[in-house]
Amino acid sequence: YNAKREKSGITVCRGEIIPKGLYHLSVSVWIVNQQGQYLLSQRHPKKQYPLYWECTGGSVLSGETSFQGAIREVKEELGILLTPGSEKLIYQSRRENVQDFYDVWLFHKDIKIEEMRLQETEVVDVQWVNPDKLFEMFRLKHLHPLITYVDQLIG
């Protein structure tokens, strides 16, 4: 994508340097249950920002929309199938430091932790947290450092 979020026609493979002036598309997905709790996953210890808590997310693949990438990432990392209809795009930004357009989605879904199938190379644990605990984890810097919008999420 160019700086106006228009497709550039250039495909950059994972691990390659993104040319200056171009951006890739990334998504984060927050899942909230009927009790108003947010689902957090804990990063694998061998990943960057080891053992930090975060919502699910990743890079959108070539040919996918932001929404499709969000659905795929949650299925891959947590084994949860999200269905269209409960989603809301809650935040968008262009982040120069990581050369991406960043979309944040919110889905409503009730699922028990024991029903999830964690991707072992990505996620080591999951938990449901209430908004107060989420904000406290943010304040204590227990969340992935790129998550900077928690106040907007929980309003």
Place the predicted regions along the sequence by residue:
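Acidic, metal-coordinating catalytic segment for phosphate/diphosphate chemistry
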Residues: 1-28, 34
